[in-house]
């Protein structure tokens, strides 16, 4: 049984979402960020239940010019397999049934709350595509910044240092999305994109008032399983250390 936490919507929250006529207006997401990256990047289904195993070419074969009656040595390319993991981004929404039913605006009220969750999931996903680091947060997938973080690394030639030394530096990315270059992934056998489950009316335990008491609430579940696969580092360039205060 779920527990309705102190993060649940209150009557005051509900009142703030009504216009003078008692209807639920469209809410402008003032904190919204434009994450066109999520629509621009290409996505493929992974070949693993937890992500995607990709083969990366790490070395080219040796070739040579030859003279008549002289041969050349055979050679081969060198490859390596890399397992890219996916993360599970989730959220739960629980609204007191009677609170949602006030003034008969149940559907509109739940929709306004759903839009907030969609925006939050969208922003978090866009943030993780660039700054995810499973070394610091094991629940995340590795984003692009952790892969382009050292000028002395093999892909350091694709990192341009803008020279900023402040604490508010940012980066500009140039990415050629593609199935053979850089792309998004989702686990094998799963659905792509943001998944929403309307679990309807359920009984939840509330932490407000007397502990252990129960109430009826509308419950929604949100989930997004995704990751990033970097197959060819030559197709992404990072212009790093841009001082935004100057």
Question: Each PLM stretch: what is its role?
Answer:
Residues 2-39, 52, 77-246:
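Core alpha/beta structural scaffold of self-assembling particle/tube/pore-forming proteins
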Residues 48-80:
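N-terminal low-complexity, intrinsically disordered segments
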């Amino acid at each position: 049984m779920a527990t309705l936490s102190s993060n649940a919507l209150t009557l005051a929250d509900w009142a703030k979402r009504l216009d003078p006529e008692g209807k639920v207006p469209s809410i402008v997401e003032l904190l919204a960020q434009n994450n066109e990256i999520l629509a621009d990047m290409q996505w493929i289904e992974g070949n693993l239940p937890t992500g995607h195993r990709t083969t990366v070419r790490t070395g080219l074969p040796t070739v040579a010019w030859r003279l008549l009656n002289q041969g050349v040595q055979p050679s081969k390319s060198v490859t390596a397999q890399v397992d890219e993991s996916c993360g599970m981004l989730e959220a739960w929404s629980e609204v007191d049934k009677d609170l949602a039913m006030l003034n008969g605006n149940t559907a509109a009220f739940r929709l306004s709350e759903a839009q907030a969750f969609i925006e939050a999931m969208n922003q978090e996903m866009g943030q993780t595509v660039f700054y995810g680091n499973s070394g610091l947060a094991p629940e995340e997938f590795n984003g692009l910044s952790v892969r382009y973080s050292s000028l002395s690394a093999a892909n350091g030639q694709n990192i341009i240092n803008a020279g900023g030394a402040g604490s508010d530096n940012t980066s500009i990315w140039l990415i050629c999305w593609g199935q053979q270059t850089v792309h998004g992934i989702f686990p094998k056998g799963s659905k792509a994109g943001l998944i929403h489950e309307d679990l309807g009316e359920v009984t939840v335990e509330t932490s407000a008032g007397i502990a252990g008491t129960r109430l009826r609430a509308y419950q929604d579940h949100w989930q997004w399983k995704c990751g990033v696969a970097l197959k060819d580092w030559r197709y992404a360039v990072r212009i790093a250390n841009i001082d935004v205060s100057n």
